[in-house]
């Protein structure tokens, strides 16, 4: 096995206290435990192929948490940490572990209705000025991640901006996130 692409996830948004516990459990099961199970299943095969790679889809939500997406963000932070830890653990076996951290990608998931709104997520994002990246950008980033040396590969302008702000001016992100949250309430 040359590459296993661990790409599964679902998001159930809304205020933390309003999201049913079974939705939290489902996100944990799919977004984090699913990635763990995929890694467990793949390791015996990846370790037999020098230069192989486990590629996990993380998310830009694994860069900085967002109100209304608390458990989703927590699962993506978990994938980020798992990726970093396994990259260290599996290196002696010749296995690289990488992640993709996409922001908003032009897929049908954006056509779903935003939490607490009658508009699609796509409409909400466009109105807020967020970039929606084409799926081809993800394919290019996946190849770059598999062949490259970086543990995490950001996908899309929004992910790059978020990573920059989180590193250099995290207080600004927090203020903007709180303003956005206040506007929703």
Language-model-derived ranges and their functions:
Residues 7-12:
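Conserved NAD(P)H cofactor-binding loop of Rossmann-fold oxidoreductase domains
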Residues 15-16, 23-28:
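Substrate-binding pocket helix/loop in short-chain dehydrogenase/reductase
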Residues 17, 66-70:
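Active-site loop immediately N-terminal to the catalytic Tyr-X3-Lys motif
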Residues 39, 75:
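Active-site helix of classical SDR
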Residues 59:
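Residue(s) in the substrate-gating loop at a strand-loop-helix junction
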Residues 64, 85-96:
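Active-site-adjacent segment of SDR/Rossmann-fold oxidoreductases
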Residues 92-157:
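SDR active-site lid
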């Amino acid at each position: 096995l040359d590459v296993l692409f661990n790409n599964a996830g679902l998001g159930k948004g809304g205020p933390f206290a309003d999201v049913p516990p079974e939705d939290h459990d489902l996100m944990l099961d799919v977004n984090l435990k699913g990635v763990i199970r995929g890694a467990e299943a793949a390791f015996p095969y990846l370790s037999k192929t020098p230069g192989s790679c486990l590629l996990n889809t993380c998310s830009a939500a694994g860069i900085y948490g967002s109100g209304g997406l608390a458990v989703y963000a927590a699962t993506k932070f978990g994938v980020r940490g798992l990726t970093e830890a396994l990259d260290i653990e599996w290196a002696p076996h010749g296995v690289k572990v990488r992640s993709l951290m996409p922001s908003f990608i032009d897929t049908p998931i954006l056509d779903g209705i935003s939490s607490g709104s009658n508009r699609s997520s796509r409409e909400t994002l466009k109105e807020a000025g967020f970039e929606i990246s084409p799926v081809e950008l993800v394919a290019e980033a996946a190849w770059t991640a598999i062949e490259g040396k970086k543990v995490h590969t950001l996908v899309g302008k929004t992910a790059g901006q978020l990573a920059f702000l989180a590193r250099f001016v995290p207080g600004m992100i927090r203020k903007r996130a709180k303003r956005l949250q206040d506007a929703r309430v």
